[in-house]
Amino acid sequence: NDVKLLVTIGGDDTASTATRISQFMASKNIKVQNIHVPKTIDNDLPLPEGQPTFGYQSAKEEGVRLAQTVYEDARTSGNWFIVSAMGREAGHLAFGIGASCHYPMIVIPEMFNKTEITIEKIIRLIISSMVKRKILGIDYGAVIISEGVFHFLSDREILNTGINFTFDDHGHPELGNVSKAHIFNILVQKRLIDLKITVKSRPVELGYELRCVRPIGFDLMYCNLLGLGVKKLFDQGYTACMVTSDPIGDCAPLFLKDVADKNGKVQPRLVNINSQKAAMVYQGNAQFIEEEDYEAASSYLEHPA
């Protein structure tokens, strides 16, 4: 039918489908090139270091605008806000928004790289930040949590929250039907009552409103380069690859076979929690109880350690 090129546009699921299509066409000796364009606000496709997926920067920009407004509300009202951001397995969006807004606590899946993720650990991180700010004489704050943490929680762990979920055909809780921010806010409020700590918190969900915002200049230029890059790679005969564009605008192929497992599933790019950037954000911006705070924290917590 004279089809020469299949262009797929999307995130890791679409990229995985593109990989399997490429494998199928190669097995059938079908001469159709396939080039994938990395588009997702989750920023979790395994592009070279420092290269975002297109759409991420625009979503982050809108998220920062909303998160800054929320933080100002917290300051003027003396309250806390528990914010949740999209992210699936990776915490790029929550990390990018939280770091840009100087949030005192950013909770992403990658920070649990040496321990199991549990609801209890997340609640303790939030309470720790609240108490630390009280010690510092600051009566407000905000925490942002990546919804990706739910990806690593067992069904039992989720059900033990006491939240009433609907269930899919396989008996799994349907997380898409509930606000993650509301879940954590309810659980934190219950714990604060148990601890007799007076803190008011409110939930804010940063969800679908980030997905279709007007693209910022970075993404307009970046997407243009990726589109032109597809044509360049097509003319050069490349197939079964993703188009990439580095910070100076040079386009190159990233072969899908190099970033997919044996089943053709493209592996997500997670936040590099061991990077200097992550270390500086968590060491410089995050506020939580440390050993030198134990005595002061004992006014609020029986066992601050």
Annotate each language-model stretch with its function.
Residues 13, 89-90, 222-226:
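Short, glycine/acidic-rich beta->alpha junctions
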Residues 38, 98, 230:
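Residue-level signature of catalytic and energy-coupling elements of molecular machines
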Residues 8-9, 16-35, 46-199:
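Accessory alpha-helical/coil subdomains and C-terminal extensions
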Residues 11, 55, 108-109, 118, ...:
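Alpha-helix initiation/capping motif
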Residues 156-305:
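C-terminal non-catalytic interaction/assembly regions of soluble proteins
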Residues 12-14, 39-43, 87-88, 112, ...:
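Acidic, glycine-rich active-site loops and adjacent beta-strand->loop/helix elements
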Residues 1-6:
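Alpha/propeptide regions of enzymes that mature by internal proteolysis
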